[in-house]
């Protein structure tokens, strides 16, 4: 039987996506990345069809001996590159990781302090997201506008007065590190726990260009495995031997996860090995690129946030585009030119402006993995200028983008010799390996 039209449509859409985002666009979404061909090859395996409720070697299903092995190996590898003692890879996203931690630390009606939304707090930290769904009251710590960060002195006073169950640091618009070591002693002094959401910066932490929150006093760290850490989409939880981790790990199943999408595990393990060998050079290039892009945009007349602080210490760059029509309009205009960014609230925006905020959030981690360096950041800034300031024909700029991408199609910071995979081929299953 030949393919029905519906199936042809599915295949056409999938192919179009692959061609467009893998070969024709500048992918500058700060929460995305790309796996290596090696990691993708193990992502497509029999694990994607299987279940494994519970922890390794303590499953509720049979047939999990290789799942136990790969999950244990992946956790060991992640602990090694993170310099941590505990890892749980069962959360299927960073938000699920947050939910699992928040639920253990507080009951409905309890209070939690979070980094101010202006300093980048993720929606899962707020009443609009996971905290609200769990019935936990969120109170924002004071904002230091000059440093685009938590106001340390005022936050300490608030911690002492409120005595929350826990405090959350980390964010989604995250240019500069939050004050973990400054706040940790005061959090612990009132009997609270310090949670660090490192979803965006985990790859920078294991790459040693961003301080480790666990070494600075955080009790527990949640992450995503697909942002600056370029693995499969998923979440993880780390600690340095805290009792909180044990409590969370006991309740992830059955509270928040049943099966935990086992095909993630070998791909996460492969990415951890890649980052063991290439992570530091990758993270260093990411931060050099973000700084270079910020400076290049500023030189071309854009209002880049954080000038007095050197613009950024992460993979992100934030740009105020109000004078050009706002974040919603400009993000769509850039997409027409095959430049993919997202609109984003800036520190002075009101939360209700989320649909049309002042700014753009730009992330350089994916294009860095394709091999781009500082000189390409200059080119990207020039493309922004052509679209936004010079108002060039977006179709002409799109041609330039596609032409630029022709030289950056191969994933870097990985192992090159794919021929070594041949001996692991599972041809009878028609899988890559």
From Swiss-Prot:
Name listed for the protein in its UniProt record: Serine hydroxymethyltransferase
Source organism, top-level taxon: Archaea
Organism lineage string: Archaea, Thermoproteota, Thermoprotei, Sulfolobales, Sulfolobaceae
Record organism: Saccharolobus islandicus (strain M.16.27) (Sulfolobus islandicus)
EC number: 2.1.2.-
Pathway: Amino-acid biosynthesis; glycine biosynthesis; glycine from L-serine: step 1/1
Gene Ontology biological process terms in this record: glycine biosynthetic process from serine; tetrahydrofolate interconversion
Keyword set includes Oxidoreductase: no
SUPFAM superfamilies linked: PLP-dependent transferases
Keywords annotated in UniProt: Amino-acid biosynthesis, Cytoplasm, One-carbon metabolism, Pyridoxal phosphate, Transferase
Family matches, as HAMAP family: SHMT
């Amino acid at each position: 039987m030949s393919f029905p039209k519906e199936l042809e449509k599915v295949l056409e859409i999938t192919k179009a996506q692959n061609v467009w985002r893998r070969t024709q666009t500048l992918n500058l979404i700060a929460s995305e990345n790309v796996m290596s061909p090696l990691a993708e090859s193990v992502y497509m395996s029999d694990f994607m069809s299987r279940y494994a409720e519970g922890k390794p070697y303590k499953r509720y299903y049979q047939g999990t001996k290789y799942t136990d092995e790969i999950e244990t190996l992946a956790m060991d590898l992640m602990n090694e590159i993170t310099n941590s003692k505990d890892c749980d890879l069962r959360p299927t996203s960073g938000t699920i990781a947050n939910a699992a931690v928040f639920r253990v630390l507080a009951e409905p009606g309890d209070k939690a302090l979070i980094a101010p939304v202006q300093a980048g707090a993720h929606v899962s930290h707020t009443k609009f997201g996971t905290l609200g769904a769990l019935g936990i009251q969120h109170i924002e710590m004071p904002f230091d506008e000059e440093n685009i960060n938590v106001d340390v002195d005022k936050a300490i006073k608030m911690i002492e007065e409120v005595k929350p169950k826990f405090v959350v640091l980390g964010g989604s618009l995250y240019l500069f590190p939050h004050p973990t070591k400054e706040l940790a002693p005061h959090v612990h002094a009132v009997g609270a726990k310090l949670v660090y959401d490192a979803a965006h910066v985990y790859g920078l932490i294991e790459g040693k260009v961003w301080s480790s929150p666990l070494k600075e006093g955080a009790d527990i760290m949640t992450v995503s495995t697909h942002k600056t850490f370029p693995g499969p989409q998923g979440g993880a939880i780390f600690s340095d031997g805290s009792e909180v981790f044990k409590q969370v790990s006991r309740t992830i199943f059955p509270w928040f996860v049943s099966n935990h999408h086992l095909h993630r595990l070998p791909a996460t393990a492969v990415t951890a090995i890649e980052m063991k060998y290439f992570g530091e050079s990758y993270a260093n290039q990411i931060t050099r690129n973000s700084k270079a892009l910020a400076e290049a945009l500023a030189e071309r007349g854009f209002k880049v946030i954080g000038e007095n602080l050197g613009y950024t210490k992460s993979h992100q760059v934030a740009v105020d585009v109000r004078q050009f029509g706002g974040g919603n309009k400009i993000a769509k205009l850039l997409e027409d030119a095959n430049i993919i960014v997202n609109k984003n609230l800036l520190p002075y925006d009101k939360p209700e402006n989320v649909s049309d905020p002042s700014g753009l959030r730009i992330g350089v981690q994916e294009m860095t993995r394709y091999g781009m360096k500082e000189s390409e950041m200059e080119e990207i800034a020039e493309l922004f200028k052509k679209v936004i300031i010079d108002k060039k024909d977006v179709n002409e700029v799109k041609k330039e983008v596609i032409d630029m991408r022709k030289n950056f199609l191969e994933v870097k910071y990985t192992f090159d010799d794919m021929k070594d995979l041949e001996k692991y081929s599972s041809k009878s299953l028609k899988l890559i390996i």
